Amino acid sequence: MEFKSGFLNTLQVRGYLHQCTDDVALDELMALQPITAYIGFDCTARSLHIGSLMQIMVMRYLQKFGHKIVVLLGGGTTKIGDPSGKDKARAMLSEAEIAANKAGILATINKFLNQGDGVVIADNAEWLGEVRYLEFLREIGSKFSVNAMLGLDSVRSRLDRDQNLSFLEFSYVLLQSYDFVELHRRHKCVLQIGGADQWGNIVNGIDLGRKLGLPQLYGLTTHLLLTSTGEKMGKTADGAVWLDAEMFDPGNYWQYFRNVADVEVGRLLRLFTELPMNEIAELENLQGEAINEAKKVLATEATAICHGKSAALAAENAALQVFEHNDDAGLPHFPLHKSLIAQGISVAKLLQLAGLEESISAGRRLIKGRGCKINGMVVEDADHALTHADFARNSGYITVFCGKKRRIKVVVED
């Protein structure tokens, strides 16, 4: 389908769009006039990570095409915990932890958006904290069918595996649905956007609005951020790829995108840069060693959007100093049998096997002191399990640096 509205057309062409309720009607509306859309973020950590970057980029495009945005921070729903995609309940956070996380997430989002340009920051604690239980059950709870709620993926997956699902988590969909209704009442919000795992919650919010007599509401989801093999992206030997510079520094952020698999380059250029599509097509079609130039462009452009142009250029220059003046081809090779990474091998164990450290405990001490890098990225988790995926995305090998002088190329062999 070819959309009339610039926003929806961009989402489709660049590969964000997963599902949309009544896309024809929403397209007509967005082509006719600016609308107000919202995206919600629960305050479960001090920063967002690249799993949320899809939604952040979508917000940038909402601004670009003149639409208004409500950024909803889940000061209230964080106390409950969204069960979507989770095998067990989240740990309960204190009020102070939620407040600190809220401040950190807001600071992260502020880096990506032009503040004051049609952006409203809301916190659902404002209205959920005022809810009277019996009135909520009468007005909102009566509009939900337990039969239908049991069919939600977030619920069914836990029950099918005989995993505990508390009533607290089971109630989450009611609260998210109520958020949509409340945001329409307060800000005339007509569109909710979220990841693909939020589809059930979004549709329930639309249905609640209909039952309460609100005008037509819409929902839209983006694809989850997965690799070409279906694994979640955003995990490294350094942990999650956070968008906060203190939690994941710009140099590591640059290296993360520089080290993606060749097959991912075009897709990530479309998603996480704002380069014109014709330029992306040229970069995507590079072959052999030339694809590394496209990876550098991806890394620099993505880092500039997240951390600023100067930080991106500094990260690029630092990487060039390491890699282009210390060619991988000249590094000593260490063969690693593929059976050792079938179940994953810890970084500390690899350092011992490769002779870079005398023992696993020595490797742990080195990593604790931030003295080890894999593919240019500082390793902080000594127990991170390196698997085939880590090697496959870098043509079957990784480079390991310990301090300034001990450098090897670890190659997987049969």
From Swiss-Prot:
The keyword Nucleus does not apply. Signal peptide: none annotated. The keyword Cell membrane does not apply. InterPro entries: aa-tRNA-synth_Ic, Rossmann-like_a/b/a_fold, S4_RNA-bd_sf, Tyr-tRNA-ligase, Tyr-tRNA-ligase_bac-type, Tyr-tRNA-ligase_bac_1. Its main location: cytoplasm. L-tyrosine binds at Y38, Y172, Q176. One of its GO terms (molecular function) is tyrosine-tRNA ligase activity. Gene3D superfamilies: HUPs, RNA-binding S4 domain, Tyrosyl-Transfer RNA Synthetase. GO terms for biological process: tyrosyl-tRNA aminoacylation. A motif ('HIGH' region) lies at residues 43-52. Residues 345-412 form the S4 RNA-binding domain. It is an enzyme of class 6 (ligase). ATP binds at K235. CDD domains: S4, TyrRS_core. It comes from the Bacteria. Pfam families: tRNA-synt_1b. PROSITE patterns: S4 (PS50889). Its EC number is 6.1.1.1. GO terms for cellular component: cytosol. A motif ('KMSKS' region) lies at residues 232-236. Belongs to the class-I aminoacyl-tRNA synthetase family. TyrS type 1 subfamily. PANTHER family: TYROSINE--TRNA LIGASE, MITOCHONDRIAL, TYROSYL-TRNA SYNTHETASE. Catalyzes the attachment of tyrosine to tRNA(Tyr) in a two-step reaction: tyrosine is first activated by ATP to form Tyr-AMP and then transferred to the acceptor end of tRNA(Tyr). Homodimer. This is Tyrosine--tRNA ligase. It comes from Anaplasma marginale (strain St. Maries). The lineage of its organism: Bacteria, Pseudomonadati, Pseudomonadota, Alphaproteobacteria, Rickettsiales. The gene is tyrS.
